[in-house]
Amino acid sequence: MKHIARKRFGQHFLSDAAVVDAIVGLIDPRPGQALVEIGPGLGAMTDPLVARCEHLTVVELDRDLAARLRRRAELQVIESDVLRVDFAALAMASAGRLRIVGNLPYNISTPILFHLLPAAAQVEDQHFMLQKEVVERMAAAPCSKDYGRLSVMLQWRYDIESVLDVPPEAFEPPPRVNSAVVRMLPFPAPPAVDAALLGELVATAFSQRRKLLRHTLGKWLDAREFSGTFDTQRRAEEVPVADYLALALALTPGER
């Protein structure tokens, strides 16, 4: 029986063989690597990945698709919402750093990216199909319209590169947006800032992105009795990632 894509799961199945081959080539999986695929769907990428790495862990929420996948001995199937999966624990169980791949559901792609942040130290790399607009925001530089909270939080932990553009017709059903594949390489020694603190800082800064930071972040810093130096005569989009990280470190107890 043909599986019908379910809108509530944000399902758009990759169906272009040439695109699949290009993505798998970019990933370059090898036997013995701890590969995890998020949202394998009908297996368009699963099949060529398994052919090259021999064993694969897949995370699939759709009950019917998970049942199909369980028929294959070379797959370890985790039937779960990806936002409930402990990737750090999965890495420990795999006795090696994870290589995470997937055609992510576009309706929850940003929450998935944030969910993966705490496990970055246990990850070798990540390759994801995403809405092209999201990839542009992830990789955006300061002083650009796409630069924002997502850019800062992800560029703290990863080197980010858009590696392949994918048109809507490569999917079934085709999404209404253009897509792109992003490569994310975790930095080996990122600044040791508190993730919650940095997240609050950046969210406050970008809460009114067109205003000078003295109207938003300035008040937030005053409430924390910050006595250091930080130029609030800038807009949030003008502040480099390194400056946000330095401020978060200065606000961390014991780092002042």
Swiss-Prot record:
GO molecular function (one): 16S rRNA (adenine(1518)-N(6)/adenine(1519)-N(6))-dimethyltransferase activity
Family membership: Belongs to the class I-like SAM-binding methyltransferase superfamily. rRNA adenine N(6)-methyltransferase family. RsmA subfamily.
Gene Ontology, cellular component aspect: cytosol
Catalysed reactions listed for this entry: adenosine(1518)/adenosine(1519) in 16S rRNA + 4 S-adenosyl-L-methionine = N(6)-dimethyladenosine(1518)/N(6)-dimethyladenosine(1519) in 16S rRNA + 4 S-adenosyl-L-homocysteine + 4 H(+)
Known role: Specifically dimethylates two adjacent adenosines (A1518 and A1519) in the loop of a conserved hairpin near the 3'-end of 16S rRNA in the 30S particle. May play a critical role in biogenesis of 30S subunits.
Keywords, comma-separated and alphabetical: Cytoplasm, Methyltransferase, RNA-binding, rRNA processing, S-adenosyl-L-methionine, Transferase
Descriptive protein name: Ribosomal RNA small subunit methyltransferase A
Binding site for S-adenosyl-L-methionine: H12, L14, G39, E60, D81, N103
Protein localization: Cytoplasm
This enzyme's EC code(s): 2.1.1.182
Gene field: rsmA
